[in-house]
A protein has these predicted regions:
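Conserved acidic segment of CheY-like receiver
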Residues: 5-25
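Acidic, metal-coordinating helix/loop segments flanking the phosphotransfer/catalytic sites
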Residues: 38-60, 70
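His-Asp phosphorelay/catalytic-motif detector in bacterial-type signaling
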Residues: 57-60, 87-93
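The short loop immediately C-terminal to the conserved phospho-acceptor aspartate in CheY-like receiver
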Residues: 66-72
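Short amphipathic alpha-helix used as the core "switch/output" element in two-component signaling
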Residues: 72-91, 108-111
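Short, conserved "switch-loop" micro-motifs in signal-transduction and mechanochemical regulators
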Residues: 100-103
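Short, flexible helix-to-coil linker/hinge segments that flank and couple to helix-turn-helix
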Residues: 107-111, 115-117, 123-162
C-alpha cells in the first residue's frame, strides 16, 4: 500500500524538540509518510518560507512562538512566521506550540492567527501530540487543556467586567 506523503515545516529553536516531534509523528495511524523541513530561528524559517514555491506548499507548519527574531525583515516571533505562512500557503495547517500559558497571550494567538492547533508544551504527552495531529489532519481544530481552561477563564472575567 502506498502511503500518502505530507510535508511539514517544523520551526523551533530547540533541535531536540523537532526531533521529538518527528519521532512521535512516525507512529501516526493515518498511513502517512511524513517529510519534515526544520528551521531553528525566524531568519531560517523566513528564508525557507520565502523560497518555497506556492506549488510546493507545506501541508502543516508546527511553529514555536518564542524564537530568535529576524529584525531585518521585521519577523519578531513565531506569531509573525505563522501569519506569513498562512498568507502564502493558504491550505497549510498551522499548529502553534508554546510554553506560554498566559490567557491573554493564548487568546491573542487565537484571535490573530486562528491556528488549526494551539498546544501548551507542558500539556501534552506523545499520545496527546499524536491525537492532536490526527484531529487537525482530519480538519478539526485542536486546543490543549490549558488553552481551553485559561481562555474560558479570561472570557468569564471579561464578561463579568462588562
Amino acid at each position: 500500500m502506498n502511503k500518502k506523503n505530507i510535508h511539514i515545516l517544523m520551526i523551533d529553536d530547540h533541535p531536540s524538540m523537532i526531533e521529538g516531534y518527528k519521532s512521535i509523528l512516525s507512529f501516526n495511524d493515518l498511513g502517512l509518510q511524513i517529510t519534515t523541513t526544520p528551521a531553528y530561528n525566524c531568519e531560517s524559517a523566513y528564508n525557507i518560507i520565502s523560497t518555497t514555491p506556492v506549488a510546493e506548499a507545506f501541508d502543516f507548519a508546527f511553529v514555536d512562538l518564542s524564537l530568535p527574531p529576524y529584525l531585518e525583515k521585521n519577523i519578531k516571533s513565531g506569531e509573525d512566521l505563522a501569519l506569513l505562512i498562512k498568507n502564502k500557503f493558504t491550505k497549510c495547517k498551522i499548529v502553534i506550540l508554546t510554553s506560554h500559558a498566559e490567557a491573554f497571550i493564548l487568546d491573542n494567538i487565537q484571535r490573530n492567527i486562528a491556528p488549526n492547533g494551539l498546544l501548551v508544551k507542558s500539556d501534552f504527552t506523545a499520545d496527546e501530540f499524536l491525537l492532536a495531529f490526527e484531529k487537525i489532519y482530519n480538519n478539526h481544530i485542536y486546543t490543549s487543556k490549558t488553552v481551553v481552561e485559561n481562555i474560558a477563564e479570561l472570557h468569564e472575567k471579561n464578561s463579568f467586567l462588562d
